[in-house]
Design a protein with these regions (language model features):
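Glycine-rich, aromatic-flanked loop segments that form ligand/cofactor-binding clefts
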Residues: 100-140
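C-terminal extensions of enzymes
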Residues: 329-370
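Shared catalytic-loop signature of beta/alpha-barrel
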Residues: 224-239, 247-343
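Metal-dependent enolase-superfamily TIM-barrel catalytic cores that perform enediolate-based chemistry
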Residues: 123-236
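Structured beta-strand/loop patches that form or line metal/cofactor-binding pockets in enzymes
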Residues: 1-44, 50-57, 325-330
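Hydrophobic faces of well-ordered beta-strands that scaffold small-molecule active sites
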Residues: 45-47, 131-139, 160-164, 192-196, ...
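Metal- or metallocofactor-binding catalytic centers and their adjacent structured scaffolds
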Residues: 3-5, 38-116
């Protein structure tokens, strides 16, 4: 089997509600990049990556040039014989770095391979181990009372885990109120965690954390470095989830050794695709670290790719996944599963098990042929 065509689209995804994070970062309308690989066996595979502006070392307009550079690897020969991980190893040797741009390529190769095998993608990533995956609901950093209202509404719909965005207004008192009011608004046992997305100083995160240390809450990535996050965890005694600083095996091991990684966000575009994410998943299972398996942003393709990896993970390792597609429009694969209460399940068809609609993608940004 050979890859004979690569097609790339850029699609604007608009959030249903503007998504405010710390340090002035906002998700409103963001370009997602969609990739399709066509093979000479008549099958195809889909991938997607959606970098948030000013968030991580990634940007939407960097994806297509990287794929052009990688064309000699993509069209080199028998991709199925080499395997997805073999092709991605060749891609890493040919073009070091640029993980976010390689992520949709890796995703599409896995989709194509699973379609060729006639199996759902989770069957190739570890088998179906967790059918119903718990979701979290992320709440934009807005007025504390409104955040509490949203939390109550979502938990009434079945959500059992709530992420509270912090730091958008640089107001410690408001962040303390956000955590207190959301915690009070949701049922006992609901997992509540406050996320600064690296935007807090060690001092501010410690002050906020100590003010809510009597509550059943967790903190997420308060500061820009793992050393600072570890210091905040030590000073507050609150469990911590690492996100932005987790991007490869060495960073996971460092966070574990520092004692600040009670949970971790494994995001496809940070690691470079499902191949690397699967290796990170296996390490976290060995360490006993709870995982949120997701990506930075995106629509149905990204959502389903990470849901398949989550479904192929033992239940004791899963903290949650994210139905990114529910936060944005358009839905580019209308047949993709949606949340049912506080859970989501993977499709059972071959590959990703979804059918992105060309009519929703617009004109291609890039077309390459072998």
């Amino acid at each position: 089997m050979n890859i004979i065509r690569l097609t790339v689209w850029q699609v604007p995804l608009t959030s249903h509600i503007a998504y405010n994070m710390s340090d002035g970062k906002i998700c409103d309308t963001v370009a997602t990049t969609v990739l399709r690989l066509d093979a000479d066996n008549g099958l195809f595979g889909w991938g997607e990556v959606c970098p948030i502006p000013h968030y991580l070392p990634a940007y939407a307009d960097g994806v297509a040039p990287a794929l052009i550079e990688l064309a000699p690897v993509i069209f080199a020969g028998d991709g199925l014989g080499l395997g997805v991980e073999g092709m991605m190893y060749a891609a890493d040797r040919y073009l070091p770095g640029h993980r976010y741009a390689k992520s949709p390529l890796d995703m599409a190769l896995w989709d194509l391979t699973a379609r060729t095998a006639g199996l759902p993608l989770y069957a190739l990533l570890g088998g179906l181990q967790t059918r119903q995956l718990p979701l979290y609901h992320s709440i934009s950093c807005i007025d504390p009372d409104e955040m509490a209202r949203i939390a109550a509404t979502e938990t009434a719909r079945g959500i059992t885990q709530v992420q509270v965005k912090l730091g958008a207004d640089r107001d410690n008192a408001a962040d303390i109120a956000r955590l207190q009011l959301v915690r009070a608004a949701v049922p006992e046992g609901t997992l509540v965690y406050g996320d600064w997305n690296c935007g807090a100083s060690r001092l501010d995160a410690t002050r906020v954390g100590r003010a809510v240390a009597d509550l059943d809450v967790m903190l997420e990535q308060p500061c820009a470095t793992l050393d600072e996050c570890a210091a905040v965890r030590d000073a507050t005694g609150l469990a911590m989830k690492i996100d932005e600083n987790a991007h490869d095996i060495p960073s996971l091991l460092q966070a574990w050794q520092l004692g600040c990684m009670d949970a971790v966000a494994l995001k496809s575009s940070k690691f470079g695709g499902l191949s690397a994410l699967r290796r990170a998943r296996d390490l976290c299972l060995s360490l006993g670290v709870k995982m949120c398996i997701e990506d930075t942003w995106g629509s149905d393709i990204t959502t389903m790719a990470t849901v398949h990896l989550g479904a192929a993970t033992p239940q004791q390792g899963i903290m949650n996944v994210c139905d990114l597609a529910s936060y944005v429009a358009p839905r580019i694969a209308p047949d993709a599963p949606s949340r049912q209460g506080g859970f989501i399940a993977p499709p059972t068809g071959p590959g990703l098990g979804i059918t992105p609609q060309d009519s929703l993608l617009g004109d291609p940004l890039l077309e390459l042929t072998a």
